[in-house]
Amino acid sequence: MIYLFHGSDAGKTRAKAFQWIAAARAKQPEASYLRFDATSLSEMALLNALATQGLFFKKSLILIDDPFSVAESGALVLEHLDQIQKTENIVGILAPKLLAARVKKLEAKAEKVFVCDAAEKKVRGF
């Protein structure tokens, strides 16, 4: 189950993702929480996290924080996108300023998508 957080406003996108994490942890405090950033994400760590089940709570909460900032971790997420979608764990992918081609791939697999775009500045012309 994938929740995708993206948009051109990186600050608002990050804030929305961490609000979602806080709400989910408040709702189910016994669920385990794993967070990976682009530098700590490896294939073994990702596959282990997707297969993890808690002792008292079946689902884990996993946040993959800006995986596309490092080419290898971004490729890893795209390579295992089907497994990420099919896991019983809840996976949030926080990807501010995501390229349009990647947005389409991720949105197709995501259960819910949160977009936080920067407001356009109005230019006054004469």
Residue ranges, per PLM feature:
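Conserved beta/loop motifs at nucleotide-recognition and modification sites
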Residues: 1-126
